[in-house]
Amino acid sequence: MSLQMDKIYVKVHELKFVNNLERNSHYVKIYWDDKKYKSQTKDGGCYIFNETFLIPITNIYDQKDQIIYVEIWESNLLNKQCAYTFFTLNSIKIGQIIKENITFIEVLKKCTLGLSINIVRNQKDILFFNIKELLPTFQDQEIINAVWKNEDEASIIKQLINLNTIDGITNIGNYKNSQNYNETLQKPKENISIYKSGEEIENSYIPSSTPEYVSHYIYKGAGENSSNYINKTKDTLFPTYLNNYAYNNNIKNVYDTPNGAHYSSNNNSGSNNAYSNFDHNINNSPKNNVPFSNSDNDKIFHYSRNYMPSPNSEKMLYFSCGNKKKALLIGIDYCGTQNELKGSINDAIITNELLIKKYNFYDSSMNILKLIDNQTNPNYRPTKRNILSALEWLVQDNNPGDIFFFFYSGHSYKKYDYTCIEKGGYNQTIVPCDFKTEGEIIDNDLHKYLIQPLKDGVKLVSFIDCPNSEGILNLGYKYKLKKEKWKETYNPFHVLADVTQFSYSKINEFPTEINLLEHVLITNNIEALTYHYMIQSIHSYINLYNKKKKKKIFLMSSQKFNIDRKFDFNHILKNSNSELGQQKNIIKWKKNKKK
């Protein structure tokens, strides 16, 4: 079901720079549907625009989710782009963005811009959003009723607030500058965003009031031009009575918890706000943000599953709510080579958004580093040198309470083991994009750069999407899915930190436009994810598209734990291995090799 829309109504308010000494001239550019819209140029450190744009929407029934870009430019002899952000059409359609101070993605300067972005059909819609901006404390229905009865903003405001003092007001601009408006009506919005870095700004660049996914990357799946990752999930993945339309219009419940609100006490493993499901106010979600549009009253059903994780039996050493939270994401498609893959870059991009939107990773180059081989900047291509440097960056200066995430999607090979440590005589490797000239990265080097520097009280979660990768981080224990028990691996290294590794390999028939982690972490319908649920879901999902040989999912860990442990980025297990590592096996292997 598609909603007919006429125009995107954009209002540009105040531009602020983190550097208060900024005095250059700046303007705002908006790009939509191959057209450019530009604001006036402001200078002297005062950047109050108060400009509106009515941008027509074409190709309403086009399947791809179009993107509107908003950029900040410095006006000079050579104009320079300072910062940018963008929104999907789907997010604008569903979520109201009314005078939000949005932090832009930094190019040259850090800045925030007050924005209102909504979909309108007629003049009454425009009046509604203007009044909503002026009188944020009033309910939507109150404003709608007033708009229907009046033709201008002053009359609407008069009816709503019932003030005799505005009888003589004929211009709404005069009213906004009046004492009554400034003292009575203009109430600043409460800042509900909590940033782990300690810095507090007015709002994230994705406004907390926006319920839909807001993409900051353009990526294309195989065979389609899609940039809305929610809509790429097949209907068959949902319960038969919960269709795609119901899901898309209620996906906001996944993201309705503000940053930082998902932290709980160590003993509270039964409920967690980060794992919102469709039971949470599903019938109260608006169909769209156009107040005067007709909409079908589709019946929305509840989806529920009586599945809760058991309380953690292990002792928690640290509970992270303010320490470092960093991620390294590597996606390699080996574009233009005989070894070309499809979907690895896409997986890295979508995983980046999952970390930001659901697990509250801060969207900054200081917190998330993404290496993909279609990157034009050579410093962000997944070469061997860049990968090793990125591994060092990820875990450097780690301290108890820090949380790290590592994702790799690409090829893996086997290489002869000259050290005689590996059981089968071969090292597992990951394959950089320049492997033909620089070679692969073996598992021992991965362990040296990524695992060995980690201290007790640090947590690392890793997802490895490549064949035969179960032992690629050389962790001590492997979980046997059929026997439902842990087994010690051959000659493991001793690891102090709380490290877990999910290893799997998608087949060629697996749809490249569908991200596996997206399905497991976003489209799940239980209150809290557990490690047991994770491995069962990944295993089932991969083999859903495999008609020949079943693929396996491996869960590796630096220590044993209750498999019903909740999967999150907060709780960290205390090291339970005083000694782990069997050097005698190295000697034994060498003796057998000589024979």
Curated annotation (Swiss-Prot):
Keywords assigned by UniProt, alphabetized: Hydrolase, Protease, Thiol protease, Zymogen
Activity modulation: Activated by Ca(2+).
Record: active site: H411, C466
Top-level taxonomic group: Eukaryota
A Pfam short name: C2
GO cellular component: cytoplasm
Family assignment from sequence similarity: Belongs to the peptidase C14B family.
Protein function: Cysteine protease that cleaves specifically after arginine or lysine residues.
UniProt-recorded name of the protein: Metacaspase-1
Name of the gene: MCA1
